[in-house]
Amino acid sequence: MRWGDMDAQGHVNNAAYVDYLQEARVAFLLSSSPVLQQLLNSGVLVVNHQLEYLKPVAFSDRPLTTNLWVDAIGGSRFSIGYEVYDGADLAVRARTGVVPFDLASNRLRRLTSPERELLSLALAPAEPLRPLPKLALPAHHHRYPLTVRWSDVDSYGHVNNVKYYDYIQEARISLVNDTVGWEPEAVWMVVRQDLEYLKPIDFRIEAYEVGTAVSVIGNRSFTLTAEISDPASSTIYATARTVVVGVSVLTADQRSALDRWSVASR
């Protein structure tokens, strides 16, 4: 881990784990046979992530350990499972859906027989993470203008999958600051996140938009649904759900503020 991976609450930021998963996934492909190395070089796209955060991790010079395996293989996609450990403690469970992509023709393709055969050597089906319920974003929702930075773009020429989590986070912080507030003594933890990638995001000067609404309000928790979109064309680039838990029970004022952006109240 890096010092820059820490957030304002003194532990590894939830979005940093997505970067760790990517590093492990790339290392897996590059350390395999030339066939899987070429799979990475010719193009692979992430289509979804699921992350379950089990333990906050503080900064340490002890490295985190990521166990990785292939947990499903289809005709034109495969999924990778992960467990991230802090010492002996399981900190994060995750799953990534991946599809092969032909960068030359700019289109999806099927896995070849050699690719399937080599991926199957790492096949170890595990108990899946239950998907968080998907809800459509209501017309009345929190809006956050999103500026893509030049450094957000990866070697494939579009915004890297990790950055989407940063974008969802920036919008979430804006909404939370407007509702429950970020008091020094308050601790809010992301415990679960699902994200689907629908279209690549390109660099441009004009802002995109992240829309966020509250789908569930509990005693100490709330769930947010979000979309990254183009406000001009209404094109949707990604959808996400995030579960946030606090150490204290939500106050009446906080619940009322969250309800202002609630899906159920519309």
Cite the ranges covered by each PLM segment.
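Preference for bulky hydrophobic residues occupying beta-strand positions
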Residues: M1, L51, L68, Y82, ...
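Sequence-level detector for tyrosine residue identity
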Residues: Y17-Y20, Y53, F59, Y82-Y85, ...
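Short structured motifs
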Residues: V47-L54, T65-T66, R192-L198, E209-G211
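HotDog/MaoC-like acyl-thioester-processing domains
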Residues: Y53-T65, W69-A136, D202-R204, V214-R266
